[in-house]
Amino acid sequence: MEAVVTSSQTVRAEVAELLGIEESALDPDADLIASGLDSIRMMSLSGRWRKQGIDVRFAAMAANPTVAAWTRLVGERTAESPGAATQSGDTAASAGDPDAPFPLAPIQHALWVGRNELTELGGVAAHLYVEFDGAGVDPERLRTAAAALAARHPMLRVDILGDGMQRISDRDLPVKVTDLRHLDVADAEQQLEVIRHAKSHQLLEGEVLELALTLLPDGRTRLHVDLDMQAADAVSYRNFMADLAALYRGAQLPELQYTYRQYRSAFTATPAPTVDEDRRWWTERIPDLPEPPALPLVPRAEQRDPRRGTRRWHFLDTDIRDRLFAAARARGITPAMAFAASYAGTLARWSTSRHFLLNLPMFGREPFHPDVDKLVGDFTSSLMLDVDFTEAHTPAQRARVMQEALHTSAEHATYSGLSVLRDLSRHHGSPSLAPFVFTSALGLGDLFAGDVTDQFGTPVWHISQGPQVLLDAQVTPFDGGLLVNWDVREDAFRPGVIDAMFAYQLAELERLAADDAAWDAADPPAVPPAQRAVRDAVNDTGARRSDDALHDGFFRTAAHTPDATAVIGSTGTLTYAELRERVLAVTGALQVAGIKPGDTVAVMGPKCADQVTALLAIHAAGAVYVPIGADQPADRADSILQTAGVRMALACGDEPPTFLPALTIAEAVRVGSRVHGVTPATVEPDRVAYVLFTSGSTGAPKGVEVTHAAAMNTLEFINDHFGIGPSDRSLALSTLEGDLSVLDVFGMLRAGGSLVVVDEAQRRDPDSWARLIAEHSVTVLHWMPGWLEMLLEVGGALPSVRVVPTGGDWVRTEMVRELRRAAPGVRFAGLGGATETAIHNTICEPGELPREWSAVPFGRPLPNNACRVVAADGADCPDWVPGELWVGGRGIARGYRGRPDLTAERFVVHDGRTWYRTGDLVRYLPDGQIDFVGRADHRVKISGYRIELGEVEAALRRIAGVEAAVAAVLTAPGDGRGEQLAAIVRASSPAVTVDELTRRMAELVPPHMVPSHIALVEAVPFTVGGKIDRRAVTAELTRSMAERANAQAPTYRVPSTALERALADIVSTVLDRDSVGADDDFFELGGDSVLATQAVARIREWLDSPGVMVTDIFAARRVGALARRLVDHESGSDRLEGVAELYLEVADMNSADVASALHSTSAQASR
């Protein structure tokens, strides 16, 4: 046993060694962070002491980073654990037969499993590929050096076996030579590019290191080094490349007296004393750990090449490095954490959440033997960091948050990050990954030593990639400065995202190096200049503005074309002159009743053509209208009347309400016809035109005050854009409570066209709509998407319809295609908007519908409007990043009547402008269009993951045969799993099945976004207002889930064959369960890659099935399917069944039976 040393001199010596300085130069009271000691080396030292049984915690070291303080800590902890000692290299030297297989290290195992296509983000080898551009490298000398290198480092000859073990082989390390000296320079470069592309993405099979040399014109050479990082980590790469260079120049290297195999044996034999405590600490935090950063990703099934890796890199020179390091250390921040914070801050800016999980690889070697630092192998571990930048708004604040997160996690680092991820997977019931990685090689020395570049040339191309990683950001010393690399799964990200992110981080690093004040300054905009230019162009607030009030256009038309048809209703037709006469009569009646400009008048009762007269008359009196439909509950109607401050009411029908001053519209016409000299009032455009009451999130009505100017901005654009004129007729389907009625009434009558009014008896009947369209040759349908869906389901041609602007809900692309078939030549547009944005605020008029669209985007802002996509901290989101839609400009409402608190909350001032916060989650596309993602109040959390229901719906709609989909969250009856994700789907064909939908969703979205229940329906329910009826959807799903629960009581298929029974016994043992059915899912029962490896090892040994692989368990998942795969491997079941019966016979024995059988066998053998 090696005594633990606690003297000041020893602590000082260890720290001096880590800093690379003489012990005498180290002041015991100096701040070690300011002296250059980084977090990674501090963690290594803490881990070394804890391995020795001295419980010195990393956080305690970081709190007071001096040699003197650490000496006291070591002394105190040693006194508490007087028996502290560590196993020496000698006692650990025996590691069994050196030719026998030995277990993979945890990171090795994860990389091995990740090569499997069936794992999420898998099918990729962890490899590092580098090209050295040099001159005069001799192929034979290189071959000789390579052979010596392979002999020196056994791990460069390792075989990774199918059961999760590894074994050292006796193969050599060949060098492939390609001679391109006969080509000209251009052709040689082209061939180099071909070689590079092949090697950058290859899966090495049967070898872990490939050396190749290309001979180029003019004596140049290119050395290609491709390493499978299952065999060696980055520090090991540096080691063997330095050895290769030394061997190439003829140096004699002393033989290593220790092996990686021995190291792993010693490591396993000396677990950290705090591992159980650390496991408990992490277990308590599992439910609260965040998900990875939610960046703009492309569904895997839509990626061109899911495995393609690319690299972005940038070199920071010595001056920038030194200034960054000095500024960080002056703030008590290690340089590694400064770089980590810059990377994480960039992720936060492109993520929908500023609270996420980050993966940090850690490099550390226990000093079991003097040769440990010279070995080649995998010595890495991982650390999960809970990063929360919610309240961190400057680079310095983020760096402190990162450093504190590191200190917290490092305190409990003996329980590995991989173990944490496995625990998370079990907690969530689906695979949990941490695919965003930050790798710091600061303090580890140059990856490419000077001797390496002297012998082989300058590294001109390098890339690394790994399974289950989307983005690995690295910072490493290089050529006197720092190399900042991003290795990216390129096609996983939306176009332009990675380039914008990388540029943003580099700009921050250079800003922090140049200006010390930048560390404490707010962040600059993340929207790149090119994206800003596109947004400036589409957010045009300088278009022509009308000073008209809403009713002015009607009166001009009535003066110019009095005999034209204005209104067509179920009771008759009115010309413009007739309508004007009725309007002025009702205006007179209002004046007689004491209504003054600015007063509020309700329009009540069932939908009817007379309501057109009422609206125009109220405005002609200078008043404000408030519609209240016939189907409003009495309490709600009373609340609206009180909040709006209604002075009187005009009502459709024969009987006016009795609870306030009121007239029927017909009575108002009679009363007003006796009033002479009535003229329409002149109303300033900034006066309120109407108050529409909508339901808030609490269900309480809120009255939106919309001015004439705001509504006119939308109305004029629609009329001008679509050329709506005297020959047009629109079918007015919307009730007055829906703001589409504003365009129906005031827009059409301003244009001189005719309004065909659907009455109360017809407004729920699509057959009546189709008849009215045909009968009156309707040309314009300004409708909700749900109404169009209902109309198209009725069927039939719509030859007269030429313009269909629709908005207010999702617009299916397939519905647009159906509409174009029914109405050839129709001009269709999808519009985004809300009552608070004066009906519409964006427009998308698509030509050919792109295949990848599942719904029509909101589009671009209307003239005189502007749109922002805003993150939770108020900053503008870059392209593709979802945020809340804010709308500003002429077309927004004044606020909420009688609710100054709500007005202040939803109508906010930013940069001197008022913006309406819509609550819609949207994203800017690169062409300036705004794409609807979902509602903020439809953002839910399932199994610890935040989910946008709109994203789930969009993914479902991308599946062939799906016409419509609506997602919801609800609790299954009698189910103990809590809230679940569910969806209804309307399909175009009976061939679309729930199983097929589930399978395709698994290809498009992460597991937590795949609905656990899907119900196929004949129709999606809509409200009377034409929007998806989500309450009805929830009711339908609740009913469907209850039916399924009743029909599918938990089933358990007993394993039927001997092989199934044997496999079930092995699997149940590995999973620590009483029993496993033939159709039970291994992973749903709590299995993971480590347990799968254990199961494979036992199946190989106990069932004599050496061909079984971990991939078989990933593919089969169930005992029954696994049995079939094993039989297929052997082209028959007889032998396996016999072995399984023997296994079961032994498994059923008790210990006494086994001892007796062994004794009997021994006795027979002796005879």
From Swiss-Prot:
Source organism per UniProt: Mycobacterium sp. (strain MCS)
Pfam families on file: AMP-binding (PF00501), Condensation (PF00668), PP-binding (PF00550)
Changes after translation: 4'-phosphopantetheine is transferred from CoA to a specific serine in each of the two carrier protein domains, leading to their activation from apo to holo forms.
MF annotations from Gene Ontology: ligase activity; phosphopantetheine binding
Protein's name according to its UniProt entry: Phenyloxazoline synthase MbtB
UniProt keyword list: Ligase, Multifunctional enzyme, Phosphopantetheine, Phosphoprotein, Repeat
Location of the region described as Condensation/cyclization in the Swiss-Prot/TrEMBL record: 98-390
InterPro entries in the record: AA_adenyl_dom, ACP-like_sf, AMP-bd_C_sf, AMP-binding_CS, AMP-dep_synth/lig_dom, ANL_N_sf, CAT-like_dom_sf, Condensatn
Any one GO CC term of the record: cytoplasm
UniProt superkingdom: Bacteria
Residues annotated with O-(pantetheine 4'-phosphoryl)serine modification: S39, S1089
Annotated metabolic or biological route of this protein: Siderophore biosynthesis; mycobactin biosynthesis
